[in-house]
């Protein structure tokens, strides 16, 4: 697997370049259907040092556009995969209708609370975005509850750090990179880290249909994942694509918090061939006792200190390797 990016429209690009069911996680921040010079008035997105050529979608076409790109996102997503869609309130209805139209299910409607909203005199200050955390209807998705905090970890007031991190209101500051060239719609590293850690594993494929500043791709690589995606703005694409290969894959993993209290105590460690072989051997021994695959994966998860879906993926890969088809 390798990181692959395309300077083209995401709908045509996905049809041409990404097969069905190969993506583990979609993270994307689609255009807001607001004229570029008006975006800062609603969401306090400052315009200095912004890459030229931001491509917007017209308000009249936004609903149809949302239906079509989300159809492709669902197609490329694995049944165990999920999707995070970042949206402002101005076109939230179109995004929700596109989710329903494409047979996706909202797991959580997350509120991302940021600081420094636009000062107003005649209305309340806008200081949040919506994040729709979705999956294919009827499917079970990857979720790593102990990827950031252990069950026993407490803050200075004695409250559970894990519980706080799992709440659906995320207070994460936006990044102001004074004097540095950036894209108009750039998500903060901490926000991306949280989504990627909770919903994927090392070696998984992350896709962004609107790469922009390539922030999702950069964080994915830094956390040991692979990434793909599309950026229609040639200036933004050329300005960012060359930087990806300079990022050491997985360098952020060493800086993660301790795994205290996590029953999946090996979750953050790299897989070895020996460990994978041991999992497969143990799986066959367990199956001889007459248990179901689901029960076998649960036993393996407990014994090897890895997530349920990690066990399932290892076994599926071993079966595929033995299959002549």
What are these regions (language model features)?
Residues 1-237, 299-301, 305-311, 319:
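Core catalytic lobe of class I
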Residues 240-241:
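Conserved SAM-binding loop
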Residues 244, 315, 319:
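DNA major-groove recognition helix of helix-turn-helix
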Residues 245-252:
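Pro/Ala/Gly-rich low-complexity, hydrophilic intrinsically disordered segments
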Residues 252-258, 322-325:
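Short Lys/Arg-enriched helix C-cap and helix-to-coil transition segments
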Residues 260-268:
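Short, Lys/Arg-enriched N-terminal segment that forms or immediately precedes the first helix
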Residues 272-291:
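Short, amphipathic alpha-helical "recognition" segments used to contact nucleic acids or chromatin
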Residues 286-302:
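Short, charged amphipathic recognition helices of the HTH superfamily
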């Amino acid at each position: 697997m390798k990181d692959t990016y395309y300077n083209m429209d995401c709908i045509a690009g996905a049809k041409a370049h990404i097969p069905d069911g190969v993506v583990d996680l979609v993270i994307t921040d689609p255009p807001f259907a607001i004229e570029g010079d008006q975006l800062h008035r609603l969401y306090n997105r400052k315009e200095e040092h912004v890459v030229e050529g931001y491509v917007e979608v017209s308000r009249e076409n936004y609903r149809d556009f949302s239906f079509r790109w989300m159809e492709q996102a669902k197609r490329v997503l694995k049944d165990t995969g999920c999707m995070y869609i970042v949206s402002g309130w101005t076109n939230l209805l179109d995004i929700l209708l596109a989710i329903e139209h494409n047979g996706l299910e909202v797991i959580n409607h997350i509120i991302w609370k940021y600081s420094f909203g636009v000062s107003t005199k005649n209305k309340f200050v806008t200081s949040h975005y919506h994040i729709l955390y979705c999956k294919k209807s009827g499917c079970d998705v990857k979720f790593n509850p102990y990827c950031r905090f252990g069950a026993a970890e407490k803050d200075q007031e004695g409250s559970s750090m894990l519980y706080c991190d799992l709440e659906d209101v995320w207070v994460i500051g936006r990044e102001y990179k004074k004097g540095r060239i950036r894209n108009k719609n750039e998500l903060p590293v901490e926000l991306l880290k949280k989504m990627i850690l909770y919903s994927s594993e090392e070696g998984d494929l992350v896709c962004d249909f609107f790469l922009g500043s390539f922030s999702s791709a950069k964080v994915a690589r830094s956390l040991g994942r692979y990434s793909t995606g599309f950026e229609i703005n040639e200036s933004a694409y050329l300005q960012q694509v060359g930087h990806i290969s300079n990022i050491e894959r997985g360098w952020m993993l060493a800086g993660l918090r301790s795994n205290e209290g996590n029953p999946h105590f090996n979750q953050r460690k790299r897989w070895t061939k020996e460990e994978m072989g041991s999992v497969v051997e143990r799986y066959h021994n367990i199956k001889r006792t007459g248990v179901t695959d689901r029960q076998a994966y649960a036993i393996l998860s407990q014994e090897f200190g890895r997530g349920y879906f990690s066990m399932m993926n290892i076994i599926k890969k071993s079966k595929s390797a033995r299959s002549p088809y």
